[in-house]
Amino acid sequence: MNSGGSPLRLIVRRHERMRIAILGNSGSGKSTLARWLGDRSGAPLLDLDTVAWEPNKVAVATAEDASVSYVSAFCTSNTSWVLEGCYANLTRAALPFMPILVFLDPGEERCISNCRSRPWEPHKYASKAAQDERLPFLLTWVREYYVRGGEMSHSSYAATYAAYVGPKYLFTRAPVLDPPQAEILAWLS
C-alpha cells in the first residue's frame, strides 16, 4: 500500500500480536515512529544500530551472522515488538515473523532536515557535541543513500519492500502522531 500524498495515515488491520519492522534512510523518522509505538504499546523496541555495530567502538561492524542471530532471537523471544533501522539485511531477518513492514521514504531534503534537528541520542554518543561532530558525515551518508549500492541503499530497501508478501506500508511523508490518527491507535490494539 502506498500512503503518499495528503497527511499520511497508518491504515492497518488489527493484530493479536503487534510486530512492526520499520526501514528507511537516516532521518526518515524511523526512531520517532518506533519510540511512539513502543511507548504506547509496551512492546520492546530494537534499534538495529545497537545490533549492527560493536558497542563502545566507532564504526566497527558486528559480524553479520551474529547480528542476524540477535534479530532472530529478539523476534522469537517477544510476542510483540518494534524494530527499526537502516539495514535491509537485518530487517529481512525479522520478516519470517510476519511483521507489518513500514518503509519510510520521505525524500532526501526531509531526511537532511530531520538529521539537522535530531536530539541527542545518548545510546549512540557520549554527548550532543560528539553527535554533532559526526553530522557532516551523516548528511553525506543521507545524500548518497539514493545512489549507492549495498544493504543500506534505497535500492535495497525498495527491493526488500517489494519482495515482502506480508502486510506492508510505504510512506512518502511522516505519519501523523500528534494527535494520533484513529488508524494508528487501532494498530496498537
Regions found by a protein language model. Give the residues of each.
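NTP-dependent small-molecule kinase module
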Residues: 5-11, 15, 40, 144-189
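Walker A (P-loop) ATP-phosphate-binding motif of ABC ATPase nucleotide-binding domains
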Residues: 19
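Hydrophobic anchor at the beta1->P-loop junction of P-loop NTPases
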Residues: 22
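The conserved Walker
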Residues: 26
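Conserved lysine of the Walker
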Residues: 30
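Conserved substrate/cofactor phosphate-moiety recognition/catalytic segment
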Residues: 35-79
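Glycine-rich phosphate-binding loop used to anchor ATP phosphates in small-molecule kinases
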Residues: 67-109
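A glycine- and Lys/Arg-enriched "phosphate-lid" helix/loop adjacent to the NTP-binding pocket
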Residues: 106-153
